[in-house]
């Protein structure tokens, strides 16, 4: 039985999260601090890393490819689509820059929170 992991916000206080994001933004001016967590009812495998430091000029499609590299299931890449949601219910266009998403949706702590989910787009296994 797998243990449920704490969300990043549950794990760290607001003050600690602000401090972490501020240090990141000061050190890496062209990078965005992003927290990626699996949607609660998703059938997509868990991710082996939550914190990402993404280039501000990266588009959402490229960020999805980066997330795929960190899924705990190697078969997932070929069988399922991944959908990213900002603020739990906003699905950004695939060509949108992470910088514009960050500017519009960053949390008060300085991180952009993205959750991912998926669905099987190729039917059942043969």
From Swiss-Prot:
Residues 124-126 form a propeptide. Transmembrane segments: none annotated. Belongs to the ATG8 family. Pfam families: ATG8 (PF02991). GO terms for cellular component: autophagosome; autophagosome membrane. GO terms for molecular function: phosphatidylethanolamine binding. A lipid is attached at residue 123 (Phosphatidylethanolamine amidated glycine). Its main location: membrane. GO terms for biological process: autophagosome assembly; autophagosome maturation; cellular response to nitrogen starvation; mitophagy; response to bacterium. InterPro entries: Atg8-like, Ubiquitin-like_domsf. It comes from the Eukaryota. Keywords: Lipoprotein, Membrane. This is Autophagy-related protein 8-like protein DDB_G0290491. It is a lipid-anchor. It is found in: Membrane.
